[in-house]
């Protein structure tokens, strides 16, 4: 089922028993985090806090707190269906030339559907029903969460940041946390390789000293939100991909103060600029690692205008030691990644990002090994093929008789098929997440690959052990007798 906007999604979740309205006053300061954390760990529903303490605007939390709700937001009926979305993205990322006329005709509907999902620009939008400008702008009117005791200030977490570089026709959508430092100022924490930061850098080079337009959409429809965190090919905009997920074109509206276009059905829009050179220290904040991050300097976003729907809903989350909402998103999006990787590396059978590994810092790959050194080729491919795995510190590669999602299997493979010196690959001075304080230098560290596959001639001179396999006939006979044995 597809959802036109966030409110439509809320109604759909409520009908399925997947959303709970909270009538008891709960504070955005620490209390919402506690409630959402307990609910997420219990695999509970999305939560709509209708009476946040001190505010008139309700807060939506734990929206994507289960993989099933992520799938629903992407228009799928099950997590397994996300593999089909991954296959579509794999095709669009590297489309193969048609093998003949029949093949060309079979692929034509896909391209026609993609073209037909180009965003639609509208003149009037519900996200601009109310306009607040100038001195009336006050972020303190929004129920922005203060998530952890050691956090320095309230933090905007689910904002879709919209930017456009000076040499680009296409806008970039990114989700970057934003620390509130005044009634109309937040710190835009984007890492240097992310799309928004690249757009800003190019703008400063081409338009030195000129303010850089930025917009932030809060409470967009689920397809647009999830499109911003999915590995969409560079040839496809996040808005067009959201249209594919939703089944109809994404409606956009021009900002009141710039040429940027924002989701027309969003709940709240922040419009403004970044003045080149205006920076501020950001943090510390509790993060998805389970630790408070270091303080670092990032650009300041000045909010010149807030537009919103009548009676808006504020969408929020928290990040902390897994499981948290980003970790659950990672579990679901894992299914999207698998077909994309298999398109490039057909030998890959499964790919798993354990959520306890902070969603991306460790990957387990199972493969059909075909030659000596094959596992090392795959691990290097994982690090280099998709930018989403640039910060993956550990890659474990095993044979296809191992279940990548079962640590009992994986640890058995590591301890029985690896020699630590021969089968460990270490790479120095590679890009590492800036939040990773374990690396010796901020943003630069090492990576480890573990080859836990059976070793082929050339990789070892010893006779390799044979895996114990039960006798199938005996297993069937004992299955038939089992109830008679009286063993509980």
Swiss-Prot record:
One of its GO terms (cellular component) is cytosol. The active site is at 287 (proton donor). It is found in: Cell membrane. SUPFAM superfamilies: FMN-binding split barrel (SSF50475), UbiD C-terminal domain-like (SSF143968). It catalyses: a 4-hydroxy-3-(all-trans-polyprenyl)benzoate + H(+) = a 2-(all-trans-polyprenyl)phenol + CO2. Mn(2+) binds at residues 172, 238. This is 3-octaprenyl-4-hydroxybenzoate carboxy-lyase. It comes from Pseudomonas putida (strain W619). The lineage of its organism: Bacteria, Pseudomonadati, Pseudomonadota, Gammaproteobacteria, Pseudomonadales.
């Amino acid at each position: 089922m597809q959802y036109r906007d966030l409110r439509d999604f809320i109604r759909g979740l409520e009908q399925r028993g997947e959303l709970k309205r909270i009538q008891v006053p709960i504070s955005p300061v620490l209390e919402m985090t506690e409630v959402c954390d307990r609910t997420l760990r219990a695999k509970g529903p999305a939560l709509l806090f209708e009476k946040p303490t001190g505010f008139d605007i309700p807060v939506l939390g734990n929206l994507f707190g289960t993989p099933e709700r992520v799938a629903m937001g992407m228009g799928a009926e099950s997590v397994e269906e996300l593999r089909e979305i991954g296959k579509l993205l794999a095709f669009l990322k590297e489309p193969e030339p048609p093998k003949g006329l029949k093949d060309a005709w079979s692929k034509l509907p896909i391209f026609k559907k993609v073209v037909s999902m180009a965003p639609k620009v509208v003149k009037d939008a519900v996200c601009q029903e109310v306009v607040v400008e100038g001195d009336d702008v006050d972020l303190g009117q929004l129920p922005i969460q203060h998530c952890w005791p050691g956090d320095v200030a309230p933090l905007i977490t689910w904002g879709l940041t919209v930017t456009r570089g000076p040499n680009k026709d296409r806008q970039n959508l990114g989700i970057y946390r934003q620390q509130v430092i005044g009634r109309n100022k937040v710190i835009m924490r984007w890492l240097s390789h992310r799309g928004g930061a690249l757009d800003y850098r190019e703008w400063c080079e081409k338009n030195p000293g000129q303010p850089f337009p930025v917009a932030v959409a809060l409470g967009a429809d689920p397809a647009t939100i999830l499109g911003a965190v999915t590995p969409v090919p560079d040839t496809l905009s996040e808005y067009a991909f959201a249209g594919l997920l939703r089944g109809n074109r994404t409606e956009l509206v021009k900002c009141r103060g710039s040429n940027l276009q924002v989701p027309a059905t969003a709940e709240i829009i922040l419009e403004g600029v970044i003045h080149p050179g205006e920076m501020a220290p950001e943090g510390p904040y509790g993060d998805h690692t389970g630790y408070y991050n270091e303080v670092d300097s990032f650009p300041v976003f000045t909010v010149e205008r807030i537009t919103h729907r009548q009676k808006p809903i504020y969408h929020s989350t928290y990040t902390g030691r897994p499981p948290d909402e980003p970790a659950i998103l990672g579990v679901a999006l894992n299914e999207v990644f698998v077909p994309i990787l298999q398109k490039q590396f057909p030998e890959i059978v499964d790919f798993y990002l354990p959520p306890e590994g902070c969603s991306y810092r460790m990957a387990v790959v199972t493969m059909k090994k075909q030659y000596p050194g094959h596992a090392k080729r795959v691990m290097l491919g994982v690090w280099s093929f998709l930018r989403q795995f640039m910060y993956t510190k550990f890659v474990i590669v095993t044979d296809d008789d191992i279940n990548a999602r079962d640590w009992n299997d994986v640890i058995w493979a590591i301890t029985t098929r690896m020699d630590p010196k021969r089968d460990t690959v270490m790479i120095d001075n590679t890009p590492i997440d800036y939040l990773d304080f374990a690396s010796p230098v901020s943003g630069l560290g090492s990576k480890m690959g573990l080859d836990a596959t059976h070793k082929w001639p050339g990789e070892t001179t010893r006779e390799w052990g044979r895996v114990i396999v039960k006798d199938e006939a005996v297993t069937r006979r004992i299955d038939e007798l089992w109830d008679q044995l009286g063993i509980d």
